[in-house]
């Protein structure tokens, strides 16, 4: 698993940047997609009264995200041969920890180095016009922008090339992705 897998594409970005909407459109277009770990984990933890939440135990939250992302990666390996799109990837976990001022444990760093995706990673930049807070997204726009910067730095540190998506309609974002993925 140490070689980049050219058909596995990550769509990343700070909260409220439109990436999940874009992933839904990719799914509707017939592509295999994974769902975002963070939101699902928050919903599950709230439902069971758990504490692995970004506002309670960030390290535990990161561990659950790592497990989720590794499982998604393994599941999607069976789709190789056609483009697959992930709503975030393993390096997002390291970026989250860095953003929180926490050390990145060696096993998370190792996972980000071994589980490789296409070298080009799509990033949805901060977009104030569409940013909204909700029950799971408690960050301010400034925090979302800081998250985006942490993602850029982290992905570059792991050897990825960031491709910024346009601040445009979902259809235009799909066109930008198609121009690269074929």
Identify the residue ranges that each predicted region occupies.
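Conserved substrate/cofactor phosphate-moiety recognition/catalytic segment
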Residues: 27-68
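Hydrophobic anchor at the beta1->P-loop junction of P-loop NTPases
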Residues: 11
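Conserved glycine(s) of the Walker
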Residues: 18
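Glycine-rich phosphate-binding loop used to anchor ATP phosphates in small-molecule kinases
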Residues: 62-116, 131
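Post-Walker A alpha-helix
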Residues: 22-23
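P-loop (Walker A) phosphate-binding loop of NTP-binding proteins
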Residues: 14, 26
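A glycine- and Lys/Arg-enriched "phosphate-lid" helix/loop adjacent to the NTP-binding pocket
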Residues: 101-168
């Amino acid at each position: 698993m140490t070689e980049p897998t050219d058909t596995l594409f990550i769509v990343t970005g700070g909260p409220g940047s439109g990436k999940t909407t874009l992933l839904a459109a990719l799914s509707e277009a017939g592509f295999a997609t994974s769902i975002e770990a963070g939101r699902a984990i928050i919903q599950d933890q709230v439902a069971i009264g758990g504490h692995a939440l970004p506002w309670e135990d960030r390290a535990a939250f990161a561990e659950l995200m790592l497990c989720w992302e590794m499982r998604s990666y393994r599941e999607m390996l069976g789709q190789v041969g056609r483009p697959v799109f992930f709503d975030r990837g393993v390096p997002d976990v390291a970026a989250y920890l860095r953003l929180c001022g926490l050390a990145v444990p060696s096993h998370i760093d190792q996972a980000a180095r071994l589980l490789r995706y296409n070298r080009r990673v799509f990033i949805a930049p901060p977009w104030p016009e569409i940013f909204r807070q909700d029950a799971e997204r408690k960050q301010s726009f400034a925090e979302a922008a800081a998250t985006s910067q942490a993602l850029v730095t982290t992905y570059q540190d792991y050897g990825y090339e960031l491709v910024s998506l346009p601040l445009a309609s979902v259809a235009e974002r799909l066109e930008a992705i198609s121009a690269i993925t074929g």
